[in-house]
Amino acid sequence: MATTTTPTFHPFPRLSFELRNRIWELTVDPRSVEVSVVTRYPKTTKSELRNVQAGQRSHNSRLRHLRSSTAAPAQLQCCREARECLTTHPKVGYLYSRAFSELAQKTNQGFDTVLEHDPELERYIWFNFDLDTISIEGTNMHEFEAVGYQIKRLRLERVLDDEYFARTDVRSIGKVFPNLREIYIVCSLGIRDGYRRTEEDDYAGLAPENVYFLDPEHLGGVMMNSVDLDALVLEEYVAENSLEDLEGCIPTEVWEELMMQQTAGDQGQ
């Protein structure tokens, strides 16, 4: 039976150190990195059972653990040279960092939520703050206040018509993540829920072309920025409905322009 081997560039070790570093740097691609924080109570010891009545567990015994289903970058698992180049070299433009360990150390309601002996305290996630997108999906964004200022690209999943999202989450985005450059919102009920959202809501002050809406994976995972999505949905509305029926459903200035075009066309016939 034929065997398959991975191509190997044997002269690579003989290249100059600078050239090898540049090659490692060129292997770096943007990733979407899933990050979440889970809270649990540790098992109660016998001494605690004797000293604490049932149902009166202290808040400061809660443990916050960092979780991610995203594997570490392959380059960092390749060899020592690649790992050192992409994490410590001063001339490499896109460096990976041990990130987000402070999320497990955040205090909650005035109590320290990590016990000193908890081994989970040392957990971290490799993240490139210049390229990677942090994907928090349905997690409360306030869990990320300790690191929000570092985040440039955010992905989350929400029901856009949900009252909590409209009144609270939208306002919180800019407060928790003040330095965002792009945001990716997975619309739980479908991408068309994003139609004209940037006209009504302020997503951390981002321009509409930097606000992306997505279908969930089970609906196809289609992604479009706000400008393109609005244009697509508007085109569909106009094709499927009479202009009279569209009044109030599309931007007023667009509706008036279309009505003028229709009137001019009728007069020219």
Residue ranges and their predicted role:
Residues 139-142:
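Alpha-helical scaffolding within the catalytic cores
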